[in-house]
């Protein structure tokens, strides 16, 4: 599958397990921004780039656990007009060290398949299944990394929404 041309940047996706989809485009279009933004599971870098395009004075850090995805994001960002605004890290959120930066906004299109069959493609399994990042871990990490008024913007299927919201409430993260 080829790349996608957006208004001010192009996304190549040949190295990523998960390709550009409606979920990521929607999240990048409506997520709240801030001065410091973190994109968890950046994949192609699409959401980080959309946030940079929308919030020109923001600094954005984008992370991905999958090496090829982090490389693809880095390549896409380097070819964009927003390369000075975004830094990409190949790491898991559990291992990520933000150097004491707290984020005003975190965006995430997380893996959401729980207890389901994984596919033969390891990259796709990492991107789609909660084995490497449970909702509990994601919420816990976000709470530690957000400022006191910070916002987590996330997109989930309706089938997992209730379990995510319950876990968020149990950990003290509230829906606005």
Q: Across the structure, where does each feature detected by a protein language model lie?
A:
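Mobile active-site "lid"/loop adjacent to the S-adenosyl-L-methionine
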Residues: 110-137
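Short loop/edge segments at beta-strand edges and connector loops
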Residues: 13, 89-91, 156
């Amino acid at each position: 599958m080829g790349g996608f041309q957006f208004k001010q940047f192009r996304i190549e996706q040949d190295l990523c397990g998960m390709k550009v989809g409606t979920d990521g485009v929607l999240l990048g279009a409506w997520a709240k921004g801030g001065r410091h933004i973190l994109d968890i599971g950046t994949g192609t870098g699409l959401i980080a780039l959309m946030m940079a395009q929308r919030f020109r004075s923001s600094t954005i850090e984008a992370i991905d656990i999958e090496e090829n995805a982090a490389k693809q994001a880095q390549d896409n960002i380097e070819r964009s007009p927003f390369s000075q605004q975004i830094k990409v890290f190949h790491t898991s959120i559990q291992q990520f060290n933000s150097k004491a930066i707290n984020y005003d906004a975190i965006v995430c299109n997380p893996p959401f398949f729980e207890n389901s069959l994984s596919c033969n493609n390891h990259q796709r399994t990492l991107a789609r299944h909660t084995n490497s990042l449970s909702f509990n871990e994601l919420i816990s990490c976000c709470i530690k990394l957000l400022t006191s008024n910070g916002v987590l913007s996330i997109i989930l299927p309706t089938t997992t929404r209730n379990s995510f919201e319950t876990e968020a409430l149990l950990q003290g993260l509230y829906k606005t």
